[in-house]
Structures are given as structure tokens and as C-alpha cells.
Amino acid sequence: MKKKHFGIWWLCGIAVVLIGILLVINLSGQGNKAESYPDLEKVDAGAVPDGFDEENQPYLGNPEAPVKIVEFSDYKCPACKQWKDQVLTELKREYLDAGKAAFYYVDMPFLAPDSTLAALAGETLYQQNHDFFWPYFDLMMEQQGKKDDAWANKGFIMKLVKDNIPDVDLKRFERELDEEIYIANVKRDFLIAENHKVDGTPTVFVNGQNVEDISFEGIKAAIDNL
């Protein structure tokens, strides 16, 4: 009887260990499961305009001004953050706040899959309320992580929006983000970039002309030469 009981307990012990191992493997697999991101290759953008589609882009300054500055950008691009901090700040002070020019932001999410999610989130906020876009843009650049890290994930974006844009309809934003309601707009921006032979970010145009020197002085010279 003792041997029989010992055998039963031994089998039960093995079963418990195996169940534990399976649970650990299952939980580990769930924890390491990669987050899914929008796939622009599968998106039909419809008709793509010949120009920059300015009337549908977020802008700063005076849209009636004769000077139109367009930037193609990726939220994960370190050079884009630097350009925003050093050049856009000066352009805003010199031209945009004075009503002498308009600045348009166009998405070119090419660095990583979460670049596309970041662009989609910005577009989704813009469609809910145009005033929500620029706080999002500023905060995403200020809190930019390492280019090779998938920091622009849904959790990061939802927290950033919840903590910093108090008037947003958060449930609507999350639903539209999950359903990728405005992904065609992001794809359209990407195709506009391709049409203008944009091969990196930041790329800047002044009145339709690609500016090679995108320092403040270079852009000022391009404006002065119009």
C-alpha cells in the first residue's frame, strides 16, 4: 500500500510541475507578443493630389500668406526633433506668428512600424478637433524615445493624450485609433512624399521648392529669393 500511494503522489507531483511549466510558457508568450501596427501597404488612399494637400494638413501661421512652408516628418526621427527645437521655433517667431507665412506638417512615417501608429494618432486627434494636434505634436517630439525602440506604442500614446489633452473624447479617440478610421489620410501623406521624391526626414519645401539647406538661415534665404 505504501508503494502504491508513493507512486500516485509521484505522478501527481509530475503533473503539477508540467502544468506549472505550461502556464509559465503561456504567460511568457503573451508577455512577449508583439504589438500590431497599421500596415500602409494594405491601405487604399484613393486619389492623391498633385500638390501637398495643404487644406487637409495641420498648419501654423496664416494660411492666406504668400509663403507656404511644408515639412515632411516622422515622429521617431531625431533630426526632426532637432529641427523643431532649433528651426521651427525661429520660423514661428519670425514668420508664422507675424502672419507672413504658413507652416504645414505632412506625415512620412517610414522609420519603424510604430511611426505609422504615431502618425495615425496625430491624424485621429486632428480629425476630432484641429486644436488637439499641435499639443500632441509638441509632446511627442519632447518625449521622443530612442529611434530603435518601439516607444511610440499604443500604451505610450494613450497615456500621453489622457494626461495632456484634457478636452479629448478619449473613448472616441481610442476606438477610432483601433479601427484605423483615418489611416487612408496617413497613406495619402506618404504617397504625397513619394510624389515629391522625399527620401528622408525632415524634408522642407518653400512654395513647392525643395530646400536643401533646412537651417533657419537656409529657409530664410529661400523665402527672400521668392
Residue map of PLM features:
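Alpha/beta-hydrolase fold active-site loops
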Residues: V67-K68
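C-terminal cap of thioredoxin/glutaredoxin-like
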Residues: M1-D39, F72, L160-L226
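N-terminal, intrinsically disordered, polar/charged segments of Gram-positive cell-envelope systems
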Residues: N26-P63, R93
